Amino acid sequence: MSTKSYAERAKAHNSPVARKLLALMHEKKTNLCASLDVRTSRKLLELADTLGPHICLLKTHVDILTDFDIETTVKPLQQLAAKHNFMIFEDRKFADIGNTVKLQYSSGVYRIAEWADITNAHGVTGPGVIAGLKEAAKLASQEPRGLLMLAELSSQGSLARGDYTAGVVEMAKLDKDFVIGFIAQRDMGGRADGFDWLIMTPGVGLDDKGDGLGQQYRTVDEVVSDGTDVIIVGRGLFDKGRDPNVEGARYRKAGWEAYLRRIGETS
């Protein structure tokens, strides 16, 4: 795993998206990504505004929203991202042939490539998924975009392990600029070959151990000590009557302190 600071890594990274995110994390002193699986744009924007000061990244599943609209969902979200200095990650999990994902990413109702700084994809269909998404990103926006490959998942019984995970890592080596890292539970290596992949880990919780639907939670210290750069927290921030401002501050502090311990610094 990397023991360099986010600031050091930002200066040397190949990807403009990764450079921006790492620099933001260093400046804002947060490695927290808020995962907001809610059904209305109003709730999404309300939580984004409350959690914004605590996060480096906001993760959406816009196909859950019953009232999605570019003008009333995306544009206000972008304004909040600018206000609070966080980036946007649409958790689309693309998993089709190159031409299909190119269209899914750039077209349709959501036009994800126009507004999401980061998205992600499965490797099951082969490297064409990377090529298709990269082509769409270039056509849809003047802003740089980044891709995370799904190497491991946090759900019980996931098939994303072993040879599959190793294959996804090899696939990521085909593109040093667009592929910025992985959704994974641990460090994926690559530094010996000149890669500095960001590791983002879902299923992080300080209280719950599971949800009864296969999700398995690990602690902040566990994942960061295993190589996680960004902790992804969802329901732990706002579910079950939790105060998102209080929980955002709590997870932010826990994540940052775990990171400082990993790089040998103290708060």
UniProtKB/Swiss-Prot annotation:
Q: Which reaction equations make up its catalytic activity?
A: orotidine 5'-phosphate + H(+) = UMP + CO2
Q: What is this protein called?
A: Orotidine 5'-phosphate decarboxylase
Any Pfam family matching the protein: OMPdecase
Tell me a GO cellular component.
Answer: cytosol
- State any single GO MF term: orotidine-5'-phosphate decarboxylase activity
Keywords of the record: Decarboxylase, Lyase, Pyrimidine biosynthesis
Q: Which residues form the active site?
A: 93 (proton donor)
GO BP annotations of the record are: 'de novo' pyrimidine nucleobase biosynthetic process; 'de novo' UMP biosynthetic process
Query: What is its pathway?
Result: Pyrimidine metabolism; UMP biosynthesis via de novo pathway; UMP from orotate: step 2/2
Q: Please give the InterPro entries that the UniProt record associates with this protein.
A: Aldolase_TIM (IPR013785), OMPdecase (IPR014732), OMPdecase_AS (IPR018089), OMPdeCOase_dom (IPR001754), RibuloseP-bd_barrel (IPR011060)
- The answer to keyword Lyase applying to this record is yes
Q: So what EC number does this one have?
A: 4.1.1.23
Domain of life (superkingdom): Eukaryota
